[in-house]
Design a protein with these regions (language model features):
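P-loop (Walker A) phosphate-binding loop of NTP-binding proteins
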Residues: 4
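Hydrophobic anchor at the beta1->P-loop junction of P-loop NTPases
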Residues: 1
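ATP-dependent small-molecule kinase phosphotransfer cores
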Residues: 28-96
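NTP-dependent small-molecule kinase module
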Residues: 149-188
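ATP-binding Walker
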Residues: 7
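Post-Walker A helix-loop "phosphate-sensing" segment adjacent to the P-loop in P-loop NTPases
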Residues: 18-28
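Walker A/P-loop
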Residues: 10
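ATP-dependent NMP and nucleoside kinases share a basic, alpha-helical "lid"
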Residues: 84-128
Length: 188
């Protein structure tokens, strides 16, 4: 499951956990960035998660692959939901969040994009003071949403899986979580 910063992915996933509990659906959510951050620490890099993308691209690539393998090794009788991004803006340019070798390690059954309108994304980014972001313009939000769809399309082709898009409109995160759970349940 992926979404650009500002779509409300974290909020939707928190709500997804609550809805799944209510409906007695067993699922486990793993944040790809959290796993990467733990691995960076093992490499002696105790950095803020917003600074991971500023690290040497070779180190990022190694850690990204290690994170995918670690996530794949999680044995769970629950449905595994991987919280990630389709792309990352690094110092070297736009980098795929799930390049081919990472995608192969994760072996997804489905790709879900959480989206919101570009105006909402830009507004949420500006309001979120907990994150370190370079720019928060409407044009940036539009471009990021487009890049996310481009990358998701490539991933779907490579993995041979469908894409679903869930809208997270302002004030409707519960509806987005319910939509997401319906999609997850349809895979069973």
């Amino acid at each position: 499951m992926a979404g650009v910063p500002g779509v409300g992915k974290t909020t939707v996933l928190q709500e997804l956990e609550a809805v799944a509990r209510e409906k007695k659906v067993s699922l486990k959510i793993v944040n790809f960035g959290d796993v990467m951050n733990q691995l960076f620490k093992k490499h002696g890099k105790n950095i803020h998660r917003d600074h991971m993308r500023r690290q040497d691209i070779n180190l990022q690539t190694r850690v990204q692959q290690q994170a995918a393998q670690k996530i794949h090794s999680i044995s769970s009788k629950s449905t595994l939901v991987v919280d990630t991004h389709m792309f990352v803006k690094t110092v070297d340019g736009i980098w795929p969040g799930t390049p081919k070798r990472v995608l192969e390690a994760l072996d997804p059954d489905l790709i879900v994009l959480i989206e919101a309108g570009p105006e909402e994304v830009a507004k949420r980014r500006t309001a979120d003071t907990t994150r370190e972001r370079e720019r928060n313009t409407l044009e940036d939000a539009k471009a990021d949403l487009e890049w996310s769809r481009y990358m998701a399309s490539v991933n779907a082709v490579l993995a041979g899986v469908p894409i679903q898009i869930v809208q997270n409109r302002e004030g409707y995160h519960r509806q987005a979580a319910e939509d997401l759970l319906r999609i997850i349940e349809s895979l069973s």
